Every structure is written in C-alpha cells, then in structure tokens.
Swiss-Prot record:
One of its GO terms (cellular component) is cytoplasm. Keywords: Cytoplasm, Endonuclease, Hydrolase, Magnesium, Metal-binding, mRNA processing, Nuclease, RNA-binding, rRNA processing, rRNA-binding, tRNA processing. Its main location: cytoplasm. Residues 161-230 form the DRBM domain. NCBIfam families: RNaseIII. This is Ribonuclease 3. It is found in: Cytoplasm. It comes from the Bacteria. The gene is rnc. It is an enzyme of class 3 (hydrolase). The keyword rRNA-binding applies. Its cofactor is Mg(2+). Residues 6-135 form the RNase III domain. It comes from Enterococcus faecalis (strain ATCC 700802 / V583).
Amino acid sequence: MDNQLTTELKERYGIVFHDVNLLEQAFTHSSYVNEHRYLKLSDNERLEFLGDAVLELIVSQYLYLKFPELPEGKLTKMRAAIVREDSLAKFAKECHFDNYILLGKGEEASGGRTRASLLCDLFEAFLGALYLDQKVGAAKKFIEDVIFPKIDAGAFSHEMDHKTQLQEVLQRKGDVSIEYRLIKEEGPAHDRTFFTEVYMNGELIGLGQGKSKKLAEQDAAERALKSIPQ
C-alpha cells in the first residue's frame, strides 16, 4: 500500500488501518485487477456496496436529528443531493483519494482517475473498508470531518424550504428566536390571501403573503433571507 496514503490518512483524519489489506482493496479498481491477475488481488466493488449502505445510514441519522421540522420528502431529497455521484466524487478529490487509486493502463489512459462515477465508487469503498476495520464509529467520525461541515455551512440548503434555510442562517449567528405572525387576511373565503411577518428576537425581518398560511410564511422567510447578510 502507498505509504503516502497511510501517512495522509493519519495526519488529516487520525485514521490508521489495522488491516491494510482492506485499505488496499478499497483503492484497487477492477481494471487493475484484470491487468494483474497473477497478483490475485480483489477489487473494491464489494466494499463499495457496503460503504454505500454505511454512508446512507449515517447521513440519514444526521439529517433526522439536525432538521426535526423537515418532512420525510425534504429529508429524502437532501440526502439524495449529499450522496449522489457528483457530490461523493468531489469529497473523494478533496480527500486526495484520486491520487492513490490503482487503475489499469486502459482505464488510466481514458481519464478514469478524474471520472466522477469511479471516484464516487472509491469514496464508498473506502467507507466500507473503514467500517469493516474499525466499525461504524470510525466511519461516522470520518463523515463528520468530511461531509457534515458542508451540510452545516448550507452547501445543500437549496434542497430545503425557505423557513428551514432561514433557521439555518440565523442559528449560525447565535442563539436566536424566530417567530411568524399572521397579521391579516384579505379576499373572499374561497380565495383568501394571508399576510405574515417573521421576527428575529422580536425584530421584524420579513413580510410575506400567500394563498395559505404556510405559503405566506415561506414567502416571508424567502424575503427575510434576501434582506439579511449571510
């Protein structure tokens, strides 16, 4: 196994594998195995299968606890954005995993080292190997270091509704109280328009309207997001 990889994992993430064969397998692409059959190596596809499940469980639990007001559909949409191919490929590159993957000559020549699908699989395979080597706690710690800060910084906030986005932005500024107040209703019963104000610590920060109370609150939150520095 590349000593530089083991050194980087230890220095950046405090990870030291007990079974380095698992680490080597995680970074071994099937194309390399096919070109080096005499070495009797195993590729990373089975580890990828396991890592996919580990990642989904840990991310799901984090989103469930962090966003108690989000419905199932919103949580599912956000999780999908986090674990999709291009996101995981980006995480793999940020971890410098692309520098260490073992590829066959043909795969290397065709640009496999920068291919999103390959890097996504590599990231999941690494998680699978880490889980087998050190159980779920180590895998969770790694994801906490690599992925959770991006969630906290709002990298996937476009997957949330405006009220949740506003809550995230304001909570980063400290302990705040957010309140929505319905101030009036206009129009006939079959075509009402609702007007809502949103307050932060008692200060008005947004005014919205909509054909339901929920839509009026969403509009108020959206307007507040546009008016406050982030």
